[in-house]
Amino acid sequence: MKPTEEKIQGNASDLPVYLFKQGNNCEAYRYFGAHLETRAGEPGIVFRVWAPHAVAISVVGDFNSWKPGSHPMHKVDGDSVWELFIPGMKEFDVYKYCVTTRAGDLVYKADPYAFHAETRPSNGSKVYDISGFAWHDEAWQAAQKKADVINGPMNIYEMHVGSWKMKEGNKPYNYAELADQLIPYITEMGYTHVELLPVMEYPFDGSWGYQVTGYFAPTSRYGTPKDFMSFVDKLHAAGIGVIMDWVPAHFPKDQFGLYNFDGEPCYEDPNPKRGEHKEWGTMVFDFGRNEVQSFLISSALYWLEQYHIDGLRVDAVASMLYLDYNRKQGEWEPNKDGGKENLEAVAFLRKLNNTVLGRHPHKYMIAEESTAWPMVCLLYTSPSP
């Protein structure tokens, strides 16, 4: 069945949107993004996206010849959350959001909550159902819940999936092949954990993956999301833990990504003295914005819960903590107390740790932090008055 104009209306629950706007929707990926759904007996896909400044949004793809406006979304909250159900769409269909900005421009954006993406040079999102994978790591998970996370021995092997080892023709191994190659080596060398340089979707093949455009999608360069689940499952079966680099500090300016998502700052801090890392050419998340907190914390929990990742190595924490990081005098503004600390980022990191470790005390939170800021990886308890 070819997708047609939306003809089936659904009533979205108010609770996910309310929690999202409060900064407390820790599983926002279950609501936002593209999800298989059946309405009035017709299977299709429901799309939801947050775009507070957009004048109009439509879903475009091969199914409608990428024609703007042919499948318009509507606001479910009268404010900033848009939805559309399209009958007949199916898994692996490619799509983007065509956003009409307040300036009258059309911008084509990948889905911030997409579970799967096209490979370079294309950058569209793909409909994907992450449910139904048969995990076999119950014994590993049970053992981890009894482990001494703080004091237990660890020997970590850091690696980049795409360049660790190449096969004939100078091609990287896919997730399945990589697991088969990696496990004997890690076992022989006596490592307890593998730490993966970022495997969240990113645009440039030649990079290490630190400029993330897909915070809920393992890079499709090496397979599907379930292929990556299988990779983790195989390592757990061999007694090897999996830690992944997670990048909440900044994101790139690629036009299809989060940057100026609806024509104006949404995910980035709107203050130019706080919202950009000029040396890196990237944008800084608006850590004080509730919707951004929901987005990032949902991403962290997504990898730990849906992919059974054992821990997160949080990248570039120092750049989050200090307003003057890599900035000269006059290029930054002090906080409300006159200091250089980014108070919103400090509060966010506390909230992140408390949420993750409150739900999963056996998971690892590891910070790349070069200034010896205390307690950046632990549960935070407010000091007694």
Regions found by a protein language model. Name each.
Residues 1-42, 74-158, 163-170, 177:
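The feature marks proteins involved in alpha-glucan
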Residues 380-385:
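Conserved small/polar residues in nucleotide/adenosyl-binding loops
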Residues 347-353, 357-373:
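Aromatic-lined carbohydrate-recognition surfaces of secreted/lumenal glycan-active proteins
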Residues 118, 138-151, 160-341:
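Substrate-binding/active-site clefts of carbohydrate-active enzymes
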Residues 43-47:
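Structural beta-strand segments of beta-rich domains
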Residues 50-56:
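Short proline/glycine-enriched turn/loop motifs at strand-loop junctions of beta-rich domains
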Residues 58-60:
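Beta-strand signatures of extracellular beta-sandwich domains
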